[in-house]
UniProtKB/Swiss-Prot annotation:
Biological source species: Pseudarthrobacter chlorophenolicus (strain ATCC 700700 / DSM 12829 / CIP 107037 / JCM 12360 / KCTC 9906 / NCIMB 13794 / A6) (Arthrobacter chlorophenolicus)
Gene Ontology process terms (BP): regulation of translational fidelity; translation
Catalytic reaction(s) noted: L-glutamyl-tRNA(Gln) + L-glutamine + ATP + H2O = L-glutaminyl-tRNA(Gln) + L-glutamate + ADP + phosphate + H(+); L-aspartyl-tRNA(Asn) + L-glutamine + ATP + H2O = L-asparaginyl-tRNA(Asn) + L-glutamate + ADP + phosphate + 2 H(+)
The protein, known as: Aspartyl/glutamyl-tRNA(Asn/Gln) amidotransferase subunit C
Cited function: Allows the formation of correctly charged Asn-tRNA(Asn) or Gln-tRNA(Gln) through the transamidation of misacylated Asp-tRNA(Asn) or Glu-tRNA(Gln) in organisms which lack either or both of asparaginyl-tRNA or glutaminyl-tRNA synthetases. The reaction takes place in the presence of glutamine and ATP through an activated phospho-Asp-tRNA(Asn) or phospho-Glu-tRNA(Gln).
Native organism taxonomy: Bacteria, Bacillati, Actinomycetota, Actinomycetes, Micrococcales
Top-level EC class as recorded in UniProt: ligase
Ranges in coiled-coil conformation: none
Gene3D superfamilies found in the cross-reference section: Glu-tRNAGln amidotransferase C subunit, N-terminal domain
Amino acid sequence: MAAINRDDVAHLARLAHIEMSAQELDRMAGELAVIVDSVKSVSEAAGDDVPATSHPIPLTNVFREDVVGHTFSAEQALSGAPDSDDNRFKVPAILDEA
């Protein structure tokens, strides 16, 4: 990976329409060089034998059997509803679709 120099930073600043002083260009070039070196060292650390992961700790789902327990009848569920229609909760329309 090529090093980031002052000219690269000046070019990026022009593309982003950011005005930078000579001192800022020098400081940013140094900071970006450190970042590039850090990314390079991380890239070298992960070999081909290391599988790609999305999370550092293995995640497993805990499944349980889906057992139907005590349920309400439609009438019981709708007993406290302000409005219902055909055994369904009736709510005000929020979209202008029929």
